[in-house]
Design a protein with these regions (language model features):
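Short, membrane-interfacial amphipathic segments enriched in basic
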Residues: 58, 74-88, 132, 142-153, ...
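Extended, low-charge hydrophobic alpha-helical regions
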Residues: 52, 59-63, 122-159, 204, ...
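Conserved phosphate-handling catalytic cores of large alpha/beta enzymes
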Residues: 1-17, 215, 222-300, 404
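Core alpha-helical transmembrane segments of integral membrane proteins
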Residues: 95-195
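Alpha-helical transmembrane helix bundles of large polytopic membrane transport and channel proteins
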Residues: 1-81
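Hydrophobic core segments of alpha-helical transmembrane domains in multi-pass membrane transport
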Residues: 104-115, 177-182, 260-262, 276-290, ...
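Juxtamembrane inter-helical linkers in multi-pass membrane proteins
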Residues: 130, 134-138, 193-221, 296-320, ...
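Transmembrane helix-loop junctions at the membrane interface of multipass transporters and ion channels
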Residues: 250-273, 441-452, 473-483
Length: 489
């Protein structure tokens, strides 16, 4: 066949391709411009070829190609099987072992919490607190020398330094959280965690692919909701968006650290971990309900390629950590600053918009007294706590800054908090803070990603009701246990 068509082929390297092609299909003869005699010659060659091999020429050539592919695959597979195990493979034999994987994961998470909330994190927090306390005292001493009025002194020392400083005091521990998560991501362990979580996420109707957006929810709910765009299934994307707000974002961390440090100092790390687990449990419960109700369909299979373990790049780790801390600082420097000033002004202006030295006549007290009865069954039916929760809908950091401004006149912030809460009511307050609706920025992002105001409002109201029910259960069950224990001599 090659001899017959050689005069029609301009490039010698194409001769074999066209010769084999003519044995399979004569349509190539038209493109080559073969004569009738040449076509009959090719037909005779094909007939002789089929008689010798005992089958159709096209089928024979197809089988030959499959045999060649099989041979290549066997060679490649045999070569891969002989590849020596790397240290990544050896570590995965432990990190992904069916019996050891989850204890290792728990140990990694426990180590992270110990670093952030143990002696090192606590010492860094106390140093930051002392800095802002001294800054406020300095303003109170220095500003009168420049003839500044008491109004501006109070605003600067109690409003700004007391409000913004109460949030920035937790920056060291927030930075440690970001640092640990970045290291785990850089070294490749977070991808293994996503693989491990696939089994559990399927129990609530999701896949391991949702783990990364959900994990980002521990940093910022807004960015986590936007990260859900990467999910291929619309069902998985919507479910992930609805469950993410139940996970404790970094903005809630200052609330946890503040109150657990005051009321549960001996078990602060365990208390903070339990609040994170509470959010995870709530997300699982809601996800299970969604899977059996509104989103009763099967999720798509999850396929992923595990990256090799790498030594984290110091440059990347520091850049990511500083970038995330920068977002925290920008929020403290803008939104928290404005809220702190607003709350301080509300404490010193009455309902007639006139300056008042009597805090009981202020707008702050009026709003707090109106909201307080709603939270009385939860154990913290006081105006300061109610207004702090209301401010938390704007930004969760504002809960701490609101309490800081409200308690600015006290000798000690911690002492003022013990007058607002008991250990039991503080536990109830923390439960509510861990579960209630996210900030307005996250809600706006949810509305944009879900393309539905109705769904967003239902999600926010449902989350507030879940938080209220959980806090009510904590406080009322705690009261019952106290009564039972007090009945024993």
């Amino acid at each position: 066949a090659a001899c017959v068509i050689s005069e029609h082929i301009r490039r010698p390297e194409q001769l074999r391709f066209y010769a084999v092609g003519l044995l399979e299909n004569m349509k190539l003869a038209d493109s080559l411009g073969l004569t009738k005699i040449q076509r009959r010659h090719i037909d005779r060659i094909r007939s002789e070829f089929e008689q010798r091999c005992g089958m159709d020429a096209a089928a024979f050539l197809a089988q030959a190609r499959y045999d060649a592919v099989d041979s290549i695959v066997r060679q490649a597979a045999g070569h891969a099987a002989k590849r020596p195990h790397t240290w990544s493979d050896r570590f995965d034999a432990l990190a992904l072992n069916r019996f050891l994987a989850f204890p290792i994961f728990a140990a990694v998470v426990s180590m992270m919490f110990t670093i952030c909330f143990g002696s090192m994190g606590l010492a860094m927090k106390r140093a930051a607190e002392q800095f802002f306390i001294q800054a406020a005292d300095f303003l109170r001493r220095a500003l009168p020398e420049f003839g500044v009025s008491n109004f501006w002194i109070g605003l600067a020392a109690d409003g700004v330094a007391g409000g913004v400083g109460s949030v920035l005091a937790f920056l060291p521990q927030v930075a440690l959280i970001f640092l640990c998560l970045t290291i785990l991501e850089e070294c490749g362990y977070l991808a293994r965690a996503a693989f491990l979580m696939d089994y559990f996420l399927r129990r609530i109707g999701l896949t391991g692919k949702s783990f990364i957006p959900l994990l980002m929810g521990f940093g910022c709910t807004t960015s986590a909701v936007m990260a859900a765009r990467t999910l291929g299934s619309d069902r998985d994307r919507r479910m992930t968006i609805l469950l993410t707000p139940y996970l404790s974002c970094s903005a809630r961390l200052p609330i946890y650290v503040l109150l657990t440090g005051v009321f549960f100092p001996s078990h602060q790390g365990a208390a903070v971990a339990m609040l994170y687990l509470l959010g995870i449990a709530a997300a699982c419960a809601v996800g299970f309900w969604l899977r059996t109700g509104p989103y009763r369909t099967y999720s798509a299979p999850y396929l992923m390629e595990l990256p090799p373990y790498r030594v984290p790049s110091l440059r990347n780790v520091l850049h990511s950590t500083f970038s995330k801390c920068g977002d925290f600082l920008r929020k403290a420097g803008t939104l928290i600053f404005l809220l702190s000033v607003l709350i301080w002004m509300m404490q010193h202006i009455n309902l007639h918009l006139l300056w008042t030295a009597d805090a009981s006549q202020s707008i702050f007290t009026a709003v707090g007294n109106a909201l307080a009865p709603l939270f009385r069954p939860l154990g913290f039916g006081n105006g300061k706590a109610a207004v702090a929760l209301l401010a938390g809908l704007v930004s969760k950091e504002a809960v701490v800054s609101s309490l800081g401004v409200a308690c600015a006149g006290a000798h000690s912030f911690e002492t003022a908090l013990t007058e607002l809460f008991t250990p039991l009511s503080a536990a109830s307050f923390l439960t509510f803070c861990a579960l209630y609706a996210p900030c307005v920025s996250a809600l706006a992002t949810m509305r944009r990603e879900l393309h539905s105001i109705k769904t967003t409002v239902i999600a926010a109201v449902s989350q507030i009701l879940v938080a209220y029910g959980a806090a009510l259960a904590v406080y009322q069950i705690g009261l019952l246990c106290q009564r039972v224990l007090s009945s024993f001599p």
